[in-house]
From Swiss-Prot:
Keyword match Cytoplasm: yes
EC class (word): isomerase
Principal cellular location given in the protein's record: cytoplasm
Matching Pfam families: FMN_dh
Residues annotated to bind substrate: R13, K14, S102, M103, R104, Q166
Species of the source: Chlorobium chlorochromatii (strain CaD3)
Protein name: Isopentenyl-diphosphate delta-isomerase
Essential cofactor(s): FMN; NADPH; Mg(2+)
Residues that, per the record, bind Mg(2+): E167
Subunit-level organization: Homooctamer. Dimer of tetramers.
Length: 357
């Protein structure tokens, strides 16, 4: 499935994505994650010691150091090797899961495959996930394609990202989303590692979640609205290439750039779906999309998530040289919420009440 010219275009796009996420205003505006609308009921008698709080938990049957995941970011170009090495080192240090960026480029060309493989070298024992996009899945991945991606990382699972809004705005985007669900079902049936399906910042609602659960996925990452808008990232790229926006009316553009379901809406709706349909209880939920602190992580757990994930905030911390310190702060945020609700363990925190402002 290699195509060297397509691989070169993908490399250039990946470099541009990282630069824009670091330096451009690509966050949602006028729409938030919704985390700020909720607060924990304070427990004036926690009856636990802060020093004894245990943040460890499980994900897909594996023990992890904390309910936090380094979300899919990048790979597939030379500079990505350094970024992924540093992310992998942090994930290994804290024993938290790590997802790599889209591996489409590895299907198009063998160039820069090492930028993905480096993650397992520096994260030899923690959970590590390969990643491919819905447009590639829709075309029908061969078993050799899937095996190559998994073997390159010695991956513990495969993430399929749903990015319809991003593809719509991307100058070279692929907007043919026929057969995505069918091919996800095929992947679940033929792949011997867990399949995780995630959005990229527009959210997964209950109806789509039900379809994906029925297809056989083992985890869903809601990746709701309120964090990074990939429409805005691609709009920047479009304007750089063409100078002005002629595809959409000015009256609709702002709504399209901020299109999506807020993260907390996704979490609460899917929690209700799982409550009403017990056959889905074992499917684990990842909260992402604007997660910006350990308090957001704590609230996510109380809303039914197994863990939370972050990409852009951790990328900024990595760029600033503060990745380890930032994760440590987030874990202290989480422990503070646990202490003040009387939850000595992550499972205990899941039972605590959230109140709505």
């Amino acid at each position: 499935m290699t195509n060297p010219s397509a691989g070169t275009l993908t490399i250039e796009r990946k470099q541009s994505h990282v630069e824009l996420c670091l330096h451009a205003n690509v966050a949602f505006s006028g729409k938030t994650t919704g985390f700020e609308r909720f607060y924990f009921e304070h427990n004036a008698l926690p009856e636990i010691a802060f020093a004894e709080i245990d943040c460890s938990t499980t994900f897909l049957g594996r023990h992890i150091g904390a309910p936090l995941m380094v979300s899919s970011m990048t790979g597939g170009y030379s500079e990505a090797s350094t970024l992924n090495r540093q992310l992998a080192e942090a994930a290994e240090h804290f024993q938290i899961p790590l997802g790599v960026g889209s591996m489409r480029q590895t299907l198009e060309s063998p160039l820069h495959r090492e930028s993905f493989a480096v993650t397992r070298k520096y994260a030899p024992t923690t959970l590590l996930f390969a990643n491919i996009g819905a447009p590639e899945v829709a075309q029908g991945l061969s078993q050799s394609d899937v095996a190559m991606m998994l073997d390159l990382l010695r991956a513990d699972g495969l993430i399929v990202h749903l990015n319809a809004a991003q593809e719509l705005f991307q100058p070279e985007g692929n907007t043919n989303f026929h057969r995505v669900l069918e091919e996800i079902h095929n992947l679940c049936a033929t792949t011997n590692v867990p399949i995780i399906v995630k959005e990229v910042g527009n959210g997964i609602g209950a109806a789509v979640a039900e379809q994906l659960m029925e297809a056989g996925v083992q985890a869903l990452d809601v990746a709701g609205a309120g964090g990074i808008s990939w429409q805005k990232v691609e709009e920047y790229r479009f304007l750089q290439q063409f100078g002005h926006e002629h595809r959409f009316s000015s009256n609709a553009l702002d709504e399209l750039l901020n299109w999506g379901i807020p993260t907390t809406n996704c979490l609460l709706d899917i929690a209700e779906l799982k409550r009403l349909q017990p056959q889905f209880q074992q499917i684990e939920i990842i909260a992402s999309g604007g997660v910006s602190s350990g308090m957001d992580v704590a609230k996510s757990l109380a809303m039914g998530a197994q863990l939370a994930a972050s990409a852009r905030h951790l990328l900024h911390a990595l760029h600033a040289g503060t990745l380890t310190a930032t994760i440590e702060q987030w874990l202290n945020d989480l422990k503070a919420a646990m202490f003040l609700t009387g939850a000595a363990t992550v499972d205990a925190l899941r039972t605590k009440s959230l109140l709505n402002h």
